A protein has these predicted regions:
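Pro/Thr/Ser/Gly-rich low-complexity, intrinsically disordered linker/stalk tracts
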Residues: 2-29, 70, 85-99
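Conserved structural position at the C-terminal beta-strand
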Residues: 80, 218-220
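Beta-strand-rich modules
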Residues: 65-85
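Extracellular carbohydrate-recognition regions
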Residues: 94-122
Length: 237
């Protein structure tokens, strides 16, 4: 029989500016991680994430804490685990102030969407998508709609295009019935297809001008694959 795995060393939690963007340096031999939160540096600690995989979202924050309160301040720590046991906890990071809520959709399924039309989950060709394993694929006319419990502040969309980019179109609404256009800034990150045939990565950032917009509609104008969406909402400016 192969020897048992060694219990992993404690991971190193990285500085945290936003509770929706928590990352750490992983431990050799770790199979998953436990994320904990506290309101005081020395606890008591509450488990907020179990069996978190640090390979599930390459090149992105590993964990988003969605169960927080505006103006709250929190401390975080992480534990590595495998079949042989768990490490001690990482270093503690905090306090981290909560300025707004954030919905993070990694495009694994439709569970966070209010409505969707003409889109399908895509998991193939990860090398072309720079190892992104979960994306939402659509063509002209396809759309995603999100409904938030408070006014939307910003919407950031990470997208891949196999051909020339066909810009996404953004609309916002207070009631889900009457819509108005939300302008978006576009930033391209393409530096060539390289030896792996990389697609063209583009990031869009939309900020609704209409106050109290709780719905946002993201429409495809051509073939594209959305890899991640971050929507901030609530809180004060």
């Amino acid at each position: 029989m192969p020897p048992a795995l060694a219990v992993p060393q404690a991971p190193v939690l990285l500085p945290i500016d936003d509770v929706a963007a928590i990352s750490w340096q992983g431990s050799a031999g770790a199979q998953s991680y436990i994320v904990e939160r506290a309101e005081k540096k020395n606890g008591p600690w509450t488990e907020i994430g179990r069996n978190v995989c640090d390979a599930a979202v390459p090149y992105r924050p590993l964990f988003a804490d969605a169960d927080v309160q505006i103006a709250g301040q929190y401390f975080y720590r992480v534990t590595a685990q495998n079949s042989s046991g768990a490490s001690g906890p990482s270093n503690t990071v905090g306090p981290v102030a909560v300025r707004h809520f954030t919905l993070v959709d990694e495009m694994r399924d439709f569970s966070l969407l209010h409505q969707h039309t003409g889109v399908t989950p895509e998991t193939g060709k990860t090398r072309n998508a720079k190892e992104d394993m979960d994306r939402m694929k659509g063509a002209a006319g396809a759309a995603l709609v999100y409904r938030l419990p408070a006014a939307i502040r910003t919407c950031t969309v990470y997208t891949f295009f196999a051909e020339e980019p066909a810009d996404l179109r953004f609309q916002v609404s207070a009631d889900g019935q009457t819509w108005q256009t939300a302008e978006a800034r576009r930033k391209d990150f393409y530096s060539g297809e390289g030896q792996y045939g990389y697609w063209k990565p583009v990031r869009y950032e939309a900020k609704p001008q209409a106050l109290q917009s709780r719905f946002i509609r993201i429409e495809f104008t051509g073939e594209a694959q959305i890899s991640r969406i971050e929507i901030t909402y609530g809180g004060a400016e």
